[in-house]
Regions:
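Short, structured helix-loop element that forms part of the nucleotide-activated donor/catalytic region
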Residues: 52-55, 243-264, 270, 352
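Carbohydrate-associated surface elements
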Residues: 177, 194
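Aromatic "clamp/platform" in nucleotide-sugar-dependent glycosyltransferases that forms part
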Residues: 272, 291
Length: 388
């Protein structure tokens, strides 16, 4: 067994928010430092002066370059492009300085802005990219309704990315389905996200009449679809409640809740959770109404607590975790009535909830941090032994 202590650098935008990528990067960095004794650094571009949202080991160093790409989000398209190029130039310069200073064995990118130049930095480290999105969502426009020039620009940008991905020492996706979306790449493998380290696999009692949803308040998370489905559910099961937790702007969804005349005592929209695992033991069902989902970590978390799940069969994430009818339900995108029917099927059948919950517990055991962490260690060992 290879016991070499590698020096690892992660490049990711930020750690200050409660996003899935932030959580997974934090988990893996902690595990590599604490369990394998690796020298781990995380290089950020955003959130200067802001603490990590998730607990970070004292053994992990954080270097914030204070580039500020997030300042460009609300800028007009062409102004955004010009400012982006200036920030990108600065980012390349200071990241190159840090990589030569640290001299890591391995540099891991979450494939944001640094993918444009990471392979050109000749610091001697093996470059790995890990993608937390489907191919369709990678480098997509975030402007809502992009104009023709914006769509053309992002299409060109995605094509350019393929050349950069091909140069990586290894390109890691989270699911087999996501891996199949890149047939032109031969340097690709699949390693899923891990179940959070502090979640103990256990089973809830399935007695509460409570449904939960966890994720950002954003269009792609589909909470508008969920509220419309809940409108159907509430008519038949007024004694059940729905609690939604997430960061972001709740106002559009609060407005929709009012427009649909939903019972605000039974349908509640909350802010972000500092400790999400406290909610699962008091839930009998988790729903994931996302329009697109690269993985779906909350599905695994719910399963670890024996909570059955309902999700739209979107992207590559949910179908890699949910076996339809076994540990949850997959619903045809974006069938609101079908989503409501699957929720109600579980609400009215406690035995089915318990059976699916128990099956989910077994599924979650496949994703422990020990198992996933050792898959990463095996990859590191292979890359270093091969001198890639």
């Amino acid at each position: 067994m290879n016991t070499r202590k590698y020096s690892i650098v992660y490049c990711t935008p930020a750690l200050y928010s409660a996003g899935g990528t932030e959580r997974v990067v934090t988990m893996k960095a902690n595990y590599f430092a604490e369990s394998f004794g690796y020298d781990v650094s995380i290089i950020l571009t955003e959130g200067y002066g802001m603490p990590p949202f998730f607990p970070l080991s004292d053994k992990v160093r954080v270097i914030n370059l204070n580039i500020g790409f997030e300042e460009l989000w609300e800028k007009p398209f062409w102004e955004k492009v010009m400012l982006y190029l200036k920030k990108q130039y600065r980012y390349k310069k200071v990241l190159q300085f840090e990589l030569f200073r640290i001299s890591p064995d391995i540099t891991i990118s979450t494939l944001r802005r640094e993918i444009n130049f990471i392979n050109d930095i000749d610091d001697g480290s093996v470059k790995i990219g890990e993608l937390h999105l489907s191919r369709a969502d990678f480098r997509g426009s975030s402007s809502g309704t992009p104009n023709v020039l914006s769509r053309w620009f992002h299409a060109w940008w995605r094509r350019r990315a393929v050349a950069s991905l091909r140069k990586l020492g290894k390109f890691v996706t989270l699911t087999d389905k996501a891996m199949s979306e890149w047939p032109e790449l031969s340097n690709i493998i699949m390693i899923p996200d891990p179940l959070p380290l502090d979640v103990k696999v256990q089973s809830t009692q399935q007695k509460s009449k409570r449904v939960i949803a966890i994720g950002r308040y954003a269009y792609e998370k589909g909470y508008d679809l969920l509220l419309r489905a809940w409108e159907l559910v509430e008519k038949r099961y007024p004694d059940w409640s729905l609690d939604v937790f997430g960061m972001g702007n709740r106002q559009p969804y609060e407005q929709l809740l009012t427009e649909l005349n939903l019972n605000t005592e039974q349908c509640r929209l909350h802010g972000v959770l500092s400790d999400v695992k406290k909610e699962y033991p008091n839930a009998s069902l988790l729903v994931l109404p996302s329009r697109t989902e690269g993985f779906g970590l909350v599905l695994l978390e719910a399963m670890a607590f024996g909570v059955p799940v309902v999700a739209f069969d979107c992207g590559s994430g949910p179908s890699s975790i949910i076996s339809d009818g076994d540990n949850g339900f997959l619903v045809q995108p974006f069938d609101i009535k079908g989503f409501a029917e699957k929720m109600m099927q579980l609400m009215e059948n406690g035995g089915l909830r318990r059976t699916m919950g128990n099956n989910g517990v077994q599924k979650a055991q496949q994703y422990t941090i020990d198992k996933i962490g050792h898959q990463w260690k095996q990859l590191f060992d292979e890359l270093m032994q091969n001198g890639i």
